[in-house]
């Protein structure tokens, strides 16, 4: 039976925290800008780590440039994180753009728009139905 929190998962969590701090405080590359580390997936032998990141940018070209800048600085970032963590082997970092946050926000906006449109239609039809009911009452009074 596997442990509830495996060593690789604990290392991935700590690596995510340390990467977030390093990218926020120590990276001076203007191409990268504000980056969020969503998740880190570490291989079983701790030789590789997939770092899932998001940016405020939605333009695919800018996102690709930022990911390439992170990949170019991966060795430097790895050395900074290695100084903060006590590991015998520091995983090689691979940065991957995670579009799930952007897609989630887009879906949430679509749902909100549909709900507001539906409420507007209900109010419009409710007003028309009330006017019809008032008209029916006026005819009954005659």
Swiss-Prot record:
Against InterPro entries, the record matches this protein to: KH_dom-like_a/b, RbfA, RbfA_dom_sf, Ribosome-bd_factorA_CS
- GO terms of biological process kind: maturation of SSU-rRNA
Query: Where does it reside?
Result: Cytoplasm
Q: Gene Ontology terms, cellular component aspect?
A: cytosol
Keyword Cytoplasm on this protein? yes
Q: Where is this region: Disordered?
A: 118-142
User: Which keywords appear in this protein's UniProt record, sorted alphabetically?
Assistant: Cytoplasm, Ribosome biogenesis
Its protein name is Ribosome-binding factor A
PROSITE patterns, A to Z: RBFA (PS01319)
Question: Which regions span the lipid bilayer?
Answer: none
* Pfam (any one): RBFA
Q: How does it assemble?
A: Monomer. Binds 30S ribosomal subunits, but not 50S ribosomal subunits or 70S ribosomes.
Which family does the UniProt entry place this protein in? Belongs to the RbfA family.
NCBIfam families, A to Z = rbfA
Q: Which domain of life is it from?
A: Bacteria
Q: What is its main location?
A: cytoplasm
Per its database record, what is this protein's job? Answer: One of several proteins that assist in the late maturation steps of the functional core of the 30S ribosomal subunit. Associates with free 30S ribosomal subunits (but not with 30S subunits that are part of 70S ribosomes or polysomes). Required for efficient processing of 16S rRNA. May interact with the 5'-terminal helix region of 16S rRNA.
A molecular function (GO) held by this record is: ribosomal small subunit binding
